[in-house]
């Protein structure tokens, strides 16, 4: 009797640490793998797995936040991480998987360490130009770390694969909701979509609310992350969260204003969408979005605007520059070789696991 194939996924805290897992899991299931997921039952990873309806066994563990600064909470979280490692050892020892795949986030650290201790191959994916703290730890225990960006040659366990995105051919959804949105929009105006990651961006939400010039000069789509803002009125559609409408709304947009998260900006690259990046600053993050934005600007894929400089005048100028030089930006995006299909990455991952 053939040995059953089993794989454990981990990663969470934000949608960005779950998205790739949700792309890969159906492929493993289709090929007959038994799939497990280790995460926090209160985290977005459990919510997303549950919502997906996929045949995945979810295992919840204790998690502690990894901080780069001093906090008394660090003392308590050391014990939480330790307990999470012990829980992960028990879970993984019982499953006996062929591999563990981690997409990062603080919840991934205990399963990664546990897998290494149990001699289970560990495969990690890093989306950003520089590693987050969780993946810096994970790298030490990894068999291979796949990266979106080229990394230093001193990081011998990394393998550059480019961005893995499921965005492909444009889909059109002729839903009633889409028709209602179009009725409120002016065909003579450019449509600008604001997207701020999995939880929206308060700075975009507040800016749209306080800048009437926006809806006088553009059709505005605001994916806000805040259901209290939901509205459909003249030149303005605000929605907290979208699934089926995501691609149709992107199709409607002439321009996109986004944060600098790797998943989103590479999706925009794959769709060849003109976009302006307003990255999170170092005061609110580790600076990864600033690095991503600099990289995209250097490559000629996008323009960037720092959050403290965001105003009606600066935004209008940046959007006008994107429109004026649209062909240059679209040509640079068309020449990009930084996108990897999910099928190609899946085949690479399965081959790597099989060779261990």
From Swiss-Prot:
Pathway involvement? Cell wall biogenesis; peptidoglycan biosynthesis
- Highest taxon of source: Bacteria
Under Gene Ontology molecular function, one entry of this record is:
undecaprenyldiphospho-muramoylpentapeptide beta-N-acetylglucosaminyltransferase activity
Q: Where UDP-N-acetyl-alpha-D-glucosamine is bound, by residue?
A: 198, 289
Keywords, comma-separated and alphabetical: Cell cycle, Cell division, Cell membrane, Cell shape, Cell wall biogenesis/degradation, Glycosyltransferase, Membrane, Peptidoglycan synthesis, Transferase
Enumerate the SUPFAM superfamilies for this protein.
UDP-Glycosyltransferase/glycogen phosphorylase (SSF53756)
Cellular compartment(s) = Cell membrane
Q: Name one GO cellular component term.
A: plasma membrane
Q: What is its EC number?
A: 2.4.1.227
| Alphabetized InterPro entries for the sequence | GlcNAc_MurG, Glyco_trans_28_C, GlycoTrans_28_N
| Reaction equations catalysed | Mur2Ac(oyl-L-Ala-gamma-D-Glu-L-Lys-D-Ala-D-Ala)-di-trans,octa-cis-undecaprenyl diphosphate + UDP-N-acetyl-alpha-D-glucosamine = beta-D-GlcNAc-(1->4)-Mur2Ac(oyl-L-Ala-gamma-D-Glu-L-Lys-D-Ala-D-Ala)-di-trans,octa-cis-undecaprenyl diphosphate + UDP + H(+)
GO BP annotations, alphabetical order? carbohydrate metabolic process; cell division; cell wall organization; lipid glycosylation; peptidoglycan biosynthetic process; regulation of cell shape
**Function statement:** Cell wall formation. Catalyzes the transfer of a GlcNAc subunit on undecaprenyl-pyrophosphoryl-MurNAc-pentapeptide (lipid intermediate I) to form undecaprenyl-pyrophosphoryl-MurNAc-(pentapeptide)GlcNAc (lipid intermediate II).
Instruction: Please give the HAMAP family that the UniProt record associates with this protein.
Output: MurG
- Please report which protein family the annotation says this sequence is part of: Belongs to the glycosyltransferase 28 family. MurG subfamily.
Q: What's the protein name?
A: UDP-N-acetylglucosamine--N-acetylmuramyl-(pentapeptide) pyrophosphoryl-undecaprenol N-acetylglucosamine transferase
Which species is listed as the source? Streptococcus thermophilus (strain ATCC BAA-491 / LMD-9)
Taxonomy-wise, where does this protein's organism fall, top ranks first?
Answer: Bacteria, Bacillati, Bacillota, Bacilli, Lactobacillales
